[in-house]
From Swiss-Prot:
Organism: Neisseria meningitidis serogroup A / serotype 4A (strain DSM 15465 / Z2491)
Domain TrmE-type G, residue spans: 216-373
Official protein name in the record: tRNA modification GTPase MnmE
One term of GO molecular function: GTP binding
Main location: cytoplasm
Record key words, sorted: Cytoplasm, GTP-binding, Hydrolase, Magnesium, Metal-binding, Nucleotide-binding, Potassium, tRNA processing
């Protein structure tokens, strides 16, 4: 990084009141700032008890000061942490004092971004920091920690090293174009390529599982009015999150709820119907429902077996994208017998369910996990993002194209290897555009 990088400061603990609050400062040559803050010169990695004072020497708070000298710190720069009492007024006064002494307020994710730019961690590890903070389940937290500790990165670095080795082998043959030799066969380049393809497939399979655990499944509930969509949402959520009455059309806006099934987040939207209406308020809810449908991975199509596919249900089915996966739910199974087979909703799975008694809920949850592609947490998994999966798919495609090259298409073979390496490098940040870095780190919390 440049020598002109400014000193930054921010509250590193969550907003609100707490027993302890932490101010984090990062920059170059921070000992004079520490001296001005508490009248002491701290030793590296030693907790120093001190009064934190304002410009007039009046105590703002008392607590612990920790100093981490560059480069042995989280950001790779000098880092100071002030651990004081966790009230918002005290934290605000301490932060303002740091700003008076020359620091500026840190942007979201700026501490982690500096750690990345100073080679303290790579991009996949940096994203692991945010994912650990945002983890919605124990499984997600465990897998995010693996990414933070470098499990995912080591897999990617291994792929890159193998790609570089194969590229060196292949590109060395380009120095001898006049030789009538099948270099790809002679150097066993194809055998090595097959091994690389298997390795990429393995990492991709793990990344897809990690992405499922991080990003979950988007589900919409659709069906005719008063068929039991809100009751099903409440049953899945285990709470009264939607109003349930005997009046058709009670739900006038899309109701959203997130649940966990075996640690996998499932984002459920109870739609406000998919029909035309003159009611302005209801029309807004219907537009939101249509948007939810367009973003969904699975639609739960609720059908009353006593009525089958009535005109309203058919109209709703016509509004669903053809490629959207569907699960047909025969609702209110406690009130009537389950109809054999489905009603032609386009669903491969039919489940009889009672939101009142809970019968069929476990079967539905298992089916949702299957539709998500979740295979269960296993050794070697790590938390991943959609961009990681897409990058690995790009590498997979380039290696597949390399395998199609003729025996003497060495230059084209080498180019596909290079592009596969670039795709893998995007994951760890070796080849990453600045605008992508800005997007990634802007989603962090301030102080991290």
């Amino acid at each position: 990084m440049s020598d002109n990088v400014p000193t930054i400061a921010a509250v590193a603990t969550a907003p609100g009141r707490g027993g302890v609050g932490v101010i984090r400062i990062s920059g170059k040559n921070l000992l004079p700032m520490a001296q001005a803050l508490c009248g002491k010169t701290p030793k590296p990695r030693v907790a120093t008890y001190a009064d934190f004072t304002d410009e007039d020497g009046q105590a703002i708070d008392s607590g612990l000061l920790l100093f981490f000298a560059a480069p042995a710190s989280f950001t790779g720069e000098d880092v100071i942490e002030l651990q004081g009492h966790g009230g918002p007024v005290v934290m605000d006064m301490l932060l303002n004092r740091c700003l008076e002494l020359g620091a500026r307020l840190a942007e979201p994710g700026e501490f982690t971004k500096r750690a990345f730019l100073n080679d303290k961690l790579d991009l996949a590890q940096a994203e692991g920091v945010a994912d650990l903070i945002d983890a919605s389940s124990r499984s997600a937290a465990r897998l995010a920690l693996r990414s933070l500790k470098g499990d995912f990165s080591r897999r990617i670095h291994g792929l890159v090293e193998d790609l570089i080795t194969l590229r060196m082998l292949v590109e060395a043959t380009l120095d001898f174009p006049e030789e009538d030799i099948d270099f790809l066969e002679a150097a066993d380049a194809r055998g090595k390529l097959d091994g690389l393809r298997r390795a990429v497939d393995d990492v991709l399979a793990n990344a897809q599982q990690g992405a499922i655990l991080r990003e979950g499944l988007n589900v919409v509930l659709v069906g005719a009015p008063n068929v039991g969509k809100s009751s099903l949402l409440n049953a899945l959520a285990g709470d009264e999150v939607a109003i349930v009455t005997d009046i058709a059309g009670t739900t006038r806006d899309a109701v959203r709820e997130r649940i966990l099934i075996d640690g996998v987040p499932v984002h459920i939207v109870d739609t406000a119907g998919l029909r035309e209406t003159d009611d302005v308020v209801e029309r807004i809810g219907i537009e939101r429902s249509r948007k939810a449908v367009s973003e969904a991975d699975v639609a739960l199509v609720l059908v009353d077996p006593r009525e089958g596919l009535n005109e309203k249900t058919r109209a709703i089915l016509d509004a669903l994208p053809l490629e959207l996966k569907r699960i047909e739910i025969h609702s209110k199974s406690d009130l009537h017998a389950h109809a054999a087979g489905g009603f032609g909703t386009g669903a491969e799975t039919v489940i009889a369910l009672s939101a009142k008694t809970g019968d069929g809920l476990d079967a539905l949850k298992r089916t949702l996990l299957r539709e998500a592609g979740w295979q269960g947490e296993s050794e070697g998994l790590f938390l991943a993002r959609t961009r990681h999966v897409n990058a690995l798919k790009a590498a997979q495609e380039e290696l597949s194209l390399a395998a199609l090259c003729g025996n003497h298409q060495i230059e084209l073979f080498a180019e596909h290897l290079r592009l596969a390496q670039v795709a893998c490098g995007e994951i760890t940040g070796e080849f990453t555009a600045d605008d992508l870095l800005g997007v990634i780190f802007s989603r962090f919390c301030i102080g991290k």
